[in-house]
């Protein structure tokens, strides 16, 4: 099973990725992990990527695609793989097709922006322990205070409404076109199968829909 999982930050991709990889016995591949592994292993591509990143540059799509091909040729990918956060752009998606990388399914977990803003902007954290609360879904016993220590809870910079809305706008401008790309590819070639799954409701219900889409 060769899957791409799409969805905005906060849509619940990480949770669903875990279920998919366990169910099909496939690795989850993110470009960040892949780059770090290649750099650490000191492969030819890893060394090129390291020199680009060390100089503050962005790793080119060509290099990313070659890393992907190298990664998916490894033994643990023989039953498939799950791409997480890749491809991010149309050129990357087109390059995957050109490189002959076959895909079985593209699953988009769709959640309205306002729901995502509420999910993320409501998070509060106890920094010392890592305990996470939510103002609506999992509030502390005393507002703004950790249940165990009584310390103040904080909102991470990444979780502020302004930051979340910015990340969502980047997602819509970059990744939404991918949805159209894969819908058209699916209509033209019959593959990969494209599924749009509403990411609201219980985790179990969403997982059931995702697994059904992949069956």
Swiss-Prot record:
Assigned EC number: 2.7.4.3
Lineage: superkingdom: Bacteria
Pathway in which the depicted protein is active: Purine metabolism; AMP biosynthesis via salvage pathway; AMP from ADP: step 1/1
Family annotation (InterPro entries): Adenyl_kin_sub (IPR006259), Adenylat/UMP-CMP_kin (IPR000850), Adenylat_kinase_CS (IPR033690), Adenylate_kinase_lid-dom (IPR007862), P-loop_NTPase (IPR027417)
Region (NMP): 30-59
Transmembrane regions: none
Binding site for ATP: 10-15, 123, 132-133, 201
Residues given in the record as AMP binding sites: 31, 36, 57-59, 85-88, 92, 156, 167
Listed GO biological process terms: AMP salvage
Localization of this protein: Cytoplasm
Catalytic activity: AMP + ATP = 2 ADP
Xref: Pfam families: ADK (PF00406), ADK_lid (PF05191)
Domain text: Consists of three domains, a large central CORE domain and two small peripheral domains, NMPbind and LID, which undergo movements during catalysis. The LID domain closes over the site of phosphoryl transfer upon ATP binding. Assembling and dissambling the active center during each catalytic cycle provides an effective means to prevent ATP hydrolysis.
Function recorded in the entry: Catalyzes the reversible transfer of the terminal phosphate group between ATP and AMP. Plays an important role in cellular energy homeostasis and in adenine nucleotide metabolism.
The name this protein goes by in its record: Adenylate kinase
Taxonomic classification: Bacteria, Pseudomonadati, Pseudomonadota, Gammaproteobacteria, Pseudomonadales
Gene transcribed to yield this protein: adk
């Amino acid at each position: 099973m060769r899957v791409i999982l799409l969805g905005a930050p906060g849509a619940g991709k990480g949770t669903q990725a875990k279920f998919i990889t366990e169910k099909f016995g496939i690795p989850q591949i993110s470009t960040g992990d892949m780059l770090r592994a290649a750099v650490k292993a000191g492969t030819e591509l890893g060394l090129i990527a390291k020199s680009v990143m060390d100089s503050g540059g962005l790793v080119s799509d060509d290099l990313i695609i070659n890393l992907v091909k190298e990664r998916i040729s490894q033994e643990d990918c023989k039953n498939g793989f799950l791409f997480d956060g890749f491809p991010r752009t149309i050129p990357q998606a087109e390059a995957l097709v050109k490189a002959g990388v076959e895909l079985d399914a593209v699953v988009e977990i769709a959640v309205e922006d306002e729901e995502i803003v509420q999910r993320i902007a409501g998070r509060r954290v106890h920094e010392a322990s890592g305990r996470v609360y939510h103002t609506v879904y999992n509030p502390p016993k005393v507002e703004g205070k950790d249940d165990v220590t009584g310390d103040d809870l904080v909102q991470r910079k990444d979780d502020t409404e302004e930051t979340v809305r910015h990340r969502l706008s980047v997602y819509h401008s970059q990744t939404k076109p991918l949805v159209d790309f894969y819908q058209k590819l699916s209509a033209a070639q019959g593959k990969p199968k494209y599924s749009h799954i509403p990411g609201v409701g219980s985790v179990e219900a969403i997982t059931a829909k995702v697994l059904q889409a992949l069956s």
